[in-house]
Amino acid sequence: MTKRNPKLAALLSVIPGLGQFYNKRPIKGTIFFIFFISFISVFYSFLNIGFWGLFTLGTVPKLDDSRVLLAQGIISILLVAFAIMLYVINILDAYRNAERFNRNEEIKDPKARMVATWDKTFPYLLISPGTFLLIFVVVFPLIFMFGVAFTNYNLYNAPPRHTLEWVGLDNFKTLFTIGVWRKTFFSVITWTLVWTLVATTLQIALGLFLAIIVNYPVVKGKKFIRTVLILPWAVPSFVTILIFVALFNDEFGAINNDILQPLLGVAPAWLSDPFWAKVALIGIQVWLGFPFVFALFTGVLQSISSDWYEAADMDGASSWQKFRNITFPHVIYATAPLLIMQYAGNFNNFNLIYLFNKGGPPVSGQNAGSTDILISWVYNLTFEFNNFNMGAVVSLIIGFIVAIVAFIQFRRTSTFKDEGGL
């Protein structure tokens, strides 16, 4: 039997399909060759314009829309990346087929070969629609946002009236060196972190406390109590937030007029005072978030074997010792990834911040409200002030912070260590 040179097969595959012909696989070689010829003939013009637009962002105002050119450039990059991936597959396929032939592992029967090929490629065919959807719904917008962060896209340079320009790191310099931007950014990110840590920790603590109380053996009517405690979760958060806005209204809200004023003689300005607005937001988020945590912890608590507690009782353990050494470690071990996602979700909790008072009240000398978090500030920068480039910069920072923190925390959880993840 004549041996085949795998390196020669790979070298011949520089011209797509030629390596497959060398390996006596004419059908596969023809498919590779036709695909790449078709790719070049169909997309050559689009790729030419796409890469030109990506580098120049247009040269003639009103005629060249920089946004469209940027989008075409990104799509061109994705198409070329896809073509390169298939090109590498073409080379590797030729190399591996030659190796299999030399080891006498090549399937001789053409029909059996087609069946084997189908079995290998079928899983990839199944996931391909979802993969393409992911690319154009998630990856493409992220790359577009990344590109906008390095342009001068704002109200005064908006296309198609003007063409955009690449400005490098100027937008990042503006955020960290210009007084009003620097002051606003650090004020907003400080409140974002405080809001995330305090609100999420309180909702988790309340959910855990209630789950332990309801799960206590002497408590009667557990089903009814659990149903009542989960009800806030059943009501759409949009509706709940609007109800709380009315309750916290400075002038006619029931919290001031019917509770605090008659009982304590005080009427905090919940919507117009920065401190009390933050207190109200944290309280509302605790109300909105604790039912999910309560339901989560309830399920975990019921999975803990009673034998553990009986053994602890025999050893003379107190209630606190049983909680510290049995209940709490077991609950955290089982729910750590979901609890981390609670923090990540509140870090980007746009709905509550915007619906309550649109990030207000305003702050003198800043271009963000006193209760704006990073995500609501991005919304205002983008849709209220048309400052798209700065909105994209802040969005990149948000994504970077969330990704790094989540990655570190996931790696530290026992659940992922035990499963060999990350």
Question: Residue locations for each model-derived region?
Answer:
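A structural signal for multi-pass alpha-helical bundles of membrane permease subunits
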Residues: 46-54, 60, 123-422
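Amphipathic alpha-helical interaction segments
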Residues: 41-45
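N-terminal signal-anchor/first transmembrane alpha helix
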Residues: 3-8, 13-16, 22, 26-27, ...
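Hydrophobic side-chain positions on well-ordered alpha-helices
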Residues: 20-21, 382
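A conserved catalytic-core signature of glycosyltransferases
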Residues: 16-17, 369
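Hydrophobic alpha-helical membrane segments of integral membrane proteins
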Residues: 30-31, 393
